Design a protein with these regions (language model features):
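Structured, non-catalytic alpha/beta "coupling" segments that mediate domain-domain communication
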Residues: 196-197, 204-208
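Glycine-rich and small/hydrophobic secondary-structure elements
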Residues: 348-355
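Immediate flanking context of iron-sulfur cluster ligation sites
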Residues: 5, 287-288, 354
Length: 527
């Protein structure tokens, strides 16, 4: 109701809840790259810019729009027409060359970029991507990289406008006139990316995308990239730290004549049985209890989303199922995703593995994963287990995804599906089987991983008509939204029985008029 009232009173058009994640909606529909304004009988064109109250506002940088996250007061000031002031930042150039290898995803790329830029140190700086590698980098991949600017510490991660930008504007249904304007304006203003350009930056670094490996990030920080074969060892290292006594403990024991404390073998501890639907299961350290395809970081990217659907399809066809202790979910950032899943015939396979649609929003990425089944929560608490989540999000700090989940791993959507099948991060899924097929034969990740050609054929199902369909009535909302009655008033009409928002008492007891005093009075006397 607050959102709808705000829209009515400011003549703005608010987008109703349940439509998707604001950053993805902005990328797919709202962003224009170049805006126009009519004034004094003339039309002026100027670059699209954006400030938002969420750190991942930077996603729009992938569309050639300069934008970043700000505080609430700054955003409110901008709404009221005030400028956003800032010091001119350093600009770090990030040169991309080559192409991703077969089987490597945009998620693997962004985790590599995040690791490199964190090591470089770009806090408070702009990062601009350049190099001939951009010519083969789809806009969805650019948006994925731009989205994680907060994780690599930059104010923004900017991609200049080029033919790839125009292709995406056309695909997502922007008017032809808008696309023509973007091309003409950016070329005239020197904002267009030309092949072979070597801009001048404060500093720079480079990456050959052909060197990128299949990766996850974890267990606690998005910049801690781990190659897929090393995830099991990274988890064991985490356990060693958990079981290792502090220096204070070792010193105390040694001072009392002991020889210190030997670090126990983590494999010998950390398991608990639980019952579910008449079956007894054993939960161990490293068990994946949450596998979530979530977040605008990846759900805005058709290639990794289609890859997840294809992995699910191949897994179901081979008779694989998710492990019973894994809570799975699918929460895209826009309704376009479910449209292209249906068009590609992949929805049924995701559903069979438990990746049912739970809504269009941030969900698990911001900690809204919901409770785990009670028997599993009790088992975790009983044995103080170090369990895991695997999600296609952008942050994995301990306690963020779920308070009982100590290790959290960022991964591409297809790897999220794979770990739901494996049920643990304690095996090397690049070499060890995920399960057995109907004949009892082991099934490996390579057996269900789609080729680039298969992914491309699936991505070809994404059409402009899907964007037109989902955004045609985006401001109208559903029946519940339309049923909300909004009073026609200049200010908000406070409701005394509201449990959500109440009239603030800040101005109820303001002091009366200042008393008349003589010239010789000091502030102590006034107070």
């Amino acid at each position: 109701e607050i959102r709808k009232v705000t829209g009515v009173q400011t003549c703005a058009l608010p987008i109703s809840p349940g439509t998707g994640i604001c950053h993805q909606v902005n990328l797919e529909y709202l962003g224009r790259t170049v805006w126009t304004k009519d004034e004094d009988g003339r039309t002026y064109a100027f670059p699209d810019t954006l400030v938002g109250t969420d750190s991942h506002t930077t996603m729009i940088n992938g569309l050639g729009v300069l934008g970043w996250g700000v505080g609430g007061i700054e955003a409110e000031a901008a709404m009221l027409g005030q400028p956003v002031s800032m010091l001119i930042p350093e600009v770090i150039g990030f040169k991309l060359t080559g192409k991703l290898k077969e089987g490597i995803t945009a998620t693997d790329l962004v985790l590599t970029v995040t690791q490199m830029l964190r090591k470089k140190g770009v806090v408070g700086k702009f990062v601009e991507f350049y190099g001939d590698g951009l010519a083969d980098l789809p806009l969805a991949d650019r948006a994925t990289i731009a989205n994680m600017a907060p994780e690599y510490g930059a104010t923004c991660g900017f991609f200049p406008v080029d033919e790839v930008t125009l292709d995406y504007l056309r695909l997502s249904g922007r008017p032809t006139q808008t696309v023509k304007l973007v091309e003409a304006y950016t070329k005239a203003q020197g904002l267009w990316r030309n092949a072979g350009q070597e801009p001048v930056f404060t500093d720079s670094l480079a990456l050959d995308m052909g060197s990128v490996e299949a990766s996850l990030a974890g267990p606690k920080r998005p910049q801690d990239r781990v190659s897929l074969p090393d995830v099991s060892q990274a988890f064991s290292d985490f356990l060693d730290l958990q079981f290792k006594p502090t220096n204070k403990e070792e010193g105390r024991l040694e001072s009392e004549g002991g020889g210190g404390v030997a670090v126990g073998n983590a494999d010998l501890v950390g398991e608990a049985d639980y019952e579910d639907d008449g079956q007894t299961y054993r939960l161990k350290n490293g068990a994946v209890v949450i596998a979530a395809i979530t977040s605008c970081t990846n759900t805005s990217n058709p290639s990794v989303m289609m890859a997840a659907g294809l992995v699910a399809k191949k897994a179901v066809e081979k008779g694989l199922t998710r492990k019973p202790w894994v809570k799975t979910s699918l929460a895209p950032g826009s309704k376009v995703v479910t449209d292209y899943y249906k068009a590609a015939g992949l929805t049924q396979y995701l559903d069979k593995l438990g990746f049912d649609l739970v809504g269009y929003g941030c969900t698990t990425c911001i900690g809204n994963s919901g409770p785990l089944p009670e028997p599993i929560e009790k088992a975790i608490q009983k044995a103080d287990l170090a369990v895991a989540s695997v999600l296609s999000g952008n942050r994995n700090f301990e306690g963020r995804v779920h308070p009982l989940v100590k290790t959290n791993w960022l991964a591409s959507p297809p790897l999220v599906v794979a770990y739901a099948l494996a049920g643990t991060v304690r095996i090397d899924i690049s070499r060890e089987p995920l399960g057995n097929d109907q004949q009892g034969n082991p099934v490996y990740l390579k057996d269900i991983w789609p080729s680039s050609q298969e992914i491309a054929e699936a991505v070809a199902q994404v059409s402009t008509s899907m964007f037109h369909k989902e955004y045609a009535e985006v401001f109208a909302g559903d029946a519940q939204w339309q049923a909300i009655e909004v009073p026609q008033a200049a200010t908000y009409v406070w409701q005394k029985d509201s449990t959500y928002i109440q009239h603030p008492p800040f101005f109820d007891d303001i002091a009366g008029p200042l008393p008349e005093i003589g010239r010789a009075s000091c502030r102590e006397r006034v107070s």
